[in-house]
């Protein structure tokens, strides 16, 4: 899985690239609103006082490791000391439903990309063309029925609306990306 943009050395570099690349192309189905001022101007600027939601548990409601919980608590204290309003709040997202919807959408799109690439090469796609994990995703994507894909998109849109309502009250959510510290590099093998 990946996230599209740039690899940079600093937030300032990323902000400059966002200034160069933000905005929708004609015909894009979705577009973020234009920023009020350049992203680069935001780097180092003092933010207004923010209302921040804190989730000191996993997104699935499970407890965090002591190390992750301490990091969230320490960061919440720092933000409070900086004058922000920090309070426990959870948008109440069904992470299992979101996971199923994401998996269906990502798998179907992965299958489509691999199929289109193989078509451009004039042959059928095979597991020899991609990593084992990608091929497994292709197989899963080929099994996603049209109505299931449509429902997955609907679920993501409902999630988006729910989060949109939540962010009417909060500027951001402080939460750990994982319940435990990340696995060491090399632990996961996408070839098997």
Language-model regions, residue ranges each:
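A short helix-breaking turn/cap at a secondary-structure junction
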Residues: 1-75, 93, 116, 124
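A non-catalytic, amphipathic alpha-helix used as a structural packing/dimerization or gating element
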Residues: 13-16, 71-74, 78, 151-158, ...
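Short helix-loop capping/hinge segments that flank enzyme active sites or metal/cofactor-binding pockets
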Residues: 41-56, 105-164, 177-189
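Short glycine-/acidic-enriched loop or helix-start segments at secondary-structure transitions
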Residues: 63-64, 98, 183-186
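Conserved dinucleotide-binding and phosphotransfer motif residues
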Residues: 82
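General small-molecule cofactor/ligand-binding pocket signal
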Residues: 85-90
């Amino acid at each position: 899985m990946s996230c599209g943009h740039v690899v940079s050395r600093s937030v300032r570099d990323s902000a400059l690239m966002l200034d160069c690349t933000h905005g929708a192309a004609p015909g894009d189905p979705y577009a973020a609103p234009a920023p009020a001022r350049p992203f680069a101007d935001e780097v180092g600027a003092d933010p207004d006082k923010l209302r921040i939601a804190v989730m000191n548990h996993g997104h699935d409601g499970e407890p965090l490791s002591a190390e992750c919980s301490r990091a969230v608590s320490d960061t919440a204290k720092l933000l409070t000391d900086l004058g922000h309003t920090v309070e426990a709040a959870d948008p109440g997202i069904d992470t299992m439903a979101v996971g199923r919807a994401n998996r269906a959408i990502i798998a179907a799109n992965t299958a489509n990309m691999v199929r289109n690439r193989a078509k451009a090469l004039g042959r059928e796609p095979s597991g020899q063309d991609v990593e084992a994990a990608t091929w497994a995703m292709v197989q899963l994507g080929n099994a996603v029925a049209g109505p299931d894909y449509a429902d997955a998109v609907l679920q993501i849109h409902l999630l988006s609306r729910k989060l949109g309502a939540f962010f009417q009250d909060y500027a951001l959510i402080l939460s750990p990306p994982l319940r435990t510290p990340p696995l060491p590099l090399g632990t996961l093998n996408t070839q098997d």
